[in-house]
Amino acid sequence: KVYVNGVKLSNSGFWTFRFVRCDGVDISKVYVEGHANWNNDGFDIESRNVTITDCVVDTDDDAICFKSEDPDYVVENVTVKNCDLSSNCNFIKFGTASAGGFRNIRVSDCTLHKCSRSLLRFWEKRVPGVSDPITGIAGMALEVVDGGFMEDVVISDLTMEDVQTPLFIRLGRRKTSE
C-alpha cells in the first residue's frame, strides 16, 4: 500500500502526483500548488482502492484527474472526500484518457473554486463571454472518448464557485479511423 500524508509540493515540472496500477493508495492532508506550466495537475490516478481526503490542491491545470490509458485495466474503488480544490481548468476530471474504464468511484464533500493565480491561461482573452482571467472551466468533467466505460460513479455535496461549466459530459470516439 502507498501512503502519502502531510506533505506540501509546489510547482512540479509536470503532473504533481501520478499513481499507475497501484492497489491501495491513501492520500491525506496533502497540499499541492502548481502554477509552473500547462500540465501542473495535482493528482493523476490510474489505480485501484484509492482514498484522497482532506487535501488542498491549487493548480493551473486539473486538480484531480482519473486516467484509464490501458484497455485491460479499470480504475476502481476510489473515494475523494473533504478536499479543497482550486483550478484554472478542470477541478475533477475523468478522462480524456479512457481506454479501460472507471468503476465504483465516490466524490463528496469538496469545495471547488478558482485558483489563487494564473500565469498561463487568461481565459477572458480566449473564450467569448468570460470576463475573469482566473476561472475554472469545468467543476466535473466526465469524458469517455477512447472506448472505455464509466459505471457507479457517485458525485455528491460539492460546492462550486467561479466555475464556467459545473458539469461537462463527453462521450466520443477519438483516435479512430472509423
What is each PLM-predicted segment?
Residues K1-E178:
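Extracellular/periplasmic carbohydrate-active domains that bind, remodel
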